[in-house]
Amino acid sequence: MTAPQISVALPVRNGANYLAEALDSILAQTYADFELHVSDNASDDATPAILADYAARDARVKVSRSAELISQVENMNRAVGLAQTQWVRMMCHDDLMRADCMEHTVAAIAIVSEAVALIGNDERHLFANGYCTPAVSDAPLQCSGGQEVIKRRFSGLGVAVVLPSITTATFRKSMFDEMGGFDDRWVHFDIFLWLRLLAERDYVWLSAQITINRIHGGQIAADARSALRSVFDYRAFIPEFVSEFGDKLGLTPVERARARLLPLGVAATSYASELQAGRWARVLRGLRLLPNAWLLPMIPLTARAIVKERRRLKALRPHVPAKMIYP
């Protein structure tokens, strides 16, 4: 029997609230030739019992428990490290896979070139009131050169190719290891690793909505908004990234300057979300932390971001209250 070519890596810490649903969706896949590696980060709720039950019933479930509490990012890296396959698909304990998620993923792997290191997919969103965004029809694969993706990301103050989240990401494990895994300095450790991967390799986007992202207040994104960490992380990361990969990417002086403006676009998007959620006090506190030179350009950028956000959420508002859209 040949070894699987792909594993699912699932990190968890006290995930008893949603874990069983996630495991059920993974193990019910139409494509079954994979292993599921779960890294339990010293959970002290019902998580260990749930995992033991599933491991006893399905040999594909491999559980490894950390004896000591480690950081979230360390546990992400630990989960990936448990996999021994060429490709790894990430999964969060609170999200769901469509029944043909792995089938679509493996079909993409079968046709991509050796230059491809990262595969992303589209997703639906599930809110606390039970509303799930409508499904759309699947469309063909889109393959992009990594350098093209980065340059488009750096243009237009961040309006560019969509990069995957944790649950929508599949990657070559060898490249993940070569890059040193996720960096726990950053709240957007996933996006920043993808950018580093794509400085070396190419990217494929699956427009099929084969995962469901559950929106709730315990997410990393919610933490990033609450502290406005996104802005300051981008401000620190971009110069470091340009210094490391700028020459390899052939970035012109103009492109380097645009890259350094990216945190402005991120800040505008963050503030637009906070304003839409009615968190004015948080925005005012955040503005005091920004460089003075940012304040004037932030006005039109934030206004533009608010217009875009309102358009994006127009279909959601009749179904989901703002406090659930922005937990």
What do the PLM-derived regions correspond to, one by one?
Residues 154-159, 187, 192, 199, ...:
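C-terminal subregions of glycosyltransferases and related glycan-biosynthesis enzymes
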Residues 14-28:
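Short, well-formed alpha-helical segments that are part of the catalytic scaffolds
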Residues 40-49, 68, 92:
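A conserved acidic beta->alpha catalytic loop
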Residues 66-83, 96:
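Glycine-rich, basic loop-to-helix element that forms the pyrophosphate-binding segment
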Residues 3-7, 27-38, 46, 59-62:
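Short loop->beta transition adjacent to catalytic acidic/histidine clusters or analogous donor-positioning motifs
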Residues 100-136:
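Conserved donor NDP-sugar-binding/catalytic core segment of glycosyltransferases
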Residues 8, 81, 98, 121, ...:
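Conserved nucleotide-sugar donor-binding catalytic segment
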Residues 88:
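Short aromatic/hydrophobic "clamp" motif used to bind/position activated sugar donors
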